[in-house]
Amino acid sequence: WTGANRTDIALHWIYRSCLTQNEADLKTAIDNVFNPMVYTTEEGFQHDNSYFQHGEQLYIGGYGDEILKGVTQVASYALGTQYQLDKEKVELLSKFMRETYYRTVRGQNMSFDVVGRSVSRPGLLNKRTTTTYAQRMIDIDPAHADEYKAIIARLNRKQPADYQVTASHTHYFRGDYSLHVRPQYNFDVRLASTRTKKCEYGNKENLKTYFMSDGCTNIVQTGDEYFNIFPVWNWRHIPGTTAPQVEKIPMDPKAWGVLGTSTYAGGVSDSIYGATAYAYMDTNPEVNTRAKKSWYFFDNEVVCLGAGIQSTSTYPVHTTVNQCFLKDGILVDKGGKEETLANGSYTLQAPQWILHDKIGYFFPQKEEVFLTAQTQSGRWYDR
């Protein structure tokens, strides 16, 4: 066993050795909790400060949750004893929690594309219960106590989602993942290449995930924009993706994740601004689509470009800008005039811009844009 799974087993042995007063078993169990706190190219903490489980699969949440739960719990037990977590491992834990894990959380909710198959479980994006991890870190890593206190305040909603959030941009070169953080919003991009696995559907969970890893994006201000939306989503229209509108969503041949087929996926960052590029290529006969896509990250805008879209699919190919909960009205440009749309389904001819929930979508070229604002229904268990 590795990573989070190993930690769960070791916790059992810690309790058992304490009850039986077996010091040798206790030391072995604690070592098994702390030993995964190293950078690796296998499952576990990656050199880019991301986290992998089930092979080369991004799992900042989900299995990332589990290893943080176990490690912070045992580290708090061992504080001040001969088993105390050493300085180097504390630094790794601190860096991952402050600069990756909690940066993917906006307000109370985590980005949907870093939790793996957990996205198909009700309520799993909400990370309020992880205040326990941050609370433990105040004692384990007192040098960053103020940061953990701010994290706790945001998670408890005693402070707004932008409270003490500072600007940052990170491209996780191991995980094929870009995260852009501003006090006003978060924006991320998840890719899949021949180096990284696509999101899994093991245990018959997350059965509609096929396009999830193909350049999907989150844009969040409060963090509630996608919370529990997934039963009513159109999974052919995952935000950021370019995909044929197939009648039935395909499934990868292996439930626990398969490597992507794109050979070009990457990004650059100076820690504040960045760019990400992706030569999307899916050779599945049901899809057989490719596109060149890129994202450029600034303070108040993200520029998303697409070119060279080719497909042999018999279905129309759509690029989805966003698919989130409807909030208030939608304001659109119609021939230079502003118009507020009623609920319904629209085909807009060459709108210059669309405004929804304080986010403006600008279309520099004259394009046909499909827009829906309506009630949708669905179920969790047919996912």
Residue spans of the language-model regions?
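Aromatic-lined, polymer-binding surfaces characteristic
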Residues: 1-121
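Extended polysaccharide-engagement surfaces of secreted carbohydrate-active enzymes
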Residues: 67, 74-383
